Amino acid sequence: GTGGGGSDAMDYHALEAMQCMIERRRGGETGVASVQLIEGKKVWKAGDEGRWSMRLLEAALSRSDSPQGLTHEDGRTQDLLGSGELMKLVEKPAAYLIEFRDGLRATLLMINGAVADYNFACKLKGKADPVSCQFFLSPTPNVTYSACLVAKIDEMLTTGAAPFPAERTMIVNGILESCLRSKHGGHKKLKTPHLEVAYRAPRESHHARS
């Protein structure tokens, strides 16, 4: 996944967006085995070494409506990754490297300065090409996040069941907290036995809609 914003709060939103996609994998969510947060030039080095996928980053960036740099200046299209502009635009890159208990690996790249939206890409078993999407956000000034939240509260009170798994909130908070401990502990890889959280996401889509 990719995101921007440069704060713990924005990182949480990007992590949750990624989690709401990968929790739907076959077998459901199984929990997190380890995390590591790396920053700066080590992020690009990790990509070169294959610790995260350049191809998936390219697919995620292809969904962005807010590429900065030359596109922002004069509207031209550009390949942020292939041209090397991405590395010039992002002064303080951060990578959340997450390993799940079932073997899945996921990476959130916070690339503030390159894009201003949230995007996702993944490799599906048996498929040659990645699949990708952008998470559309409510535009300003009519930001309707609270209205969406209230609608889900109303749905829960009406049906007597939470419309989305509370475990998602718990696991995302745990990932963020553990990654911050990694950051302040020398960017070391940390095992996360406390994040052995298993659950299944609902089959229905819970995307915001008017």
Range-by-range predicted roles:
Residues 17-21, 54-57, 116-117, 126-129, ...:
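Short, low-complexity, polar/charged sequence segments that are solvent-exposed and flexible
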Residues 20, 59, 148-151, 155, ...:
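Charged/polar, solvent-exposed surface patches and flexible loops
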Residues 24-26, 59-63, 122-124, 132-134, ...:
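Glycine-rich loops and low-complexity Gly/Arg-rich segments
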Residues 72-170:
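NAD(P)-dinucleotide binding in Rossmann-like oxidoreductases
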Residues 80, 155-210:
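C-terminal helix-rich "cap/oligomerization" subdomain common to oxidoreductases
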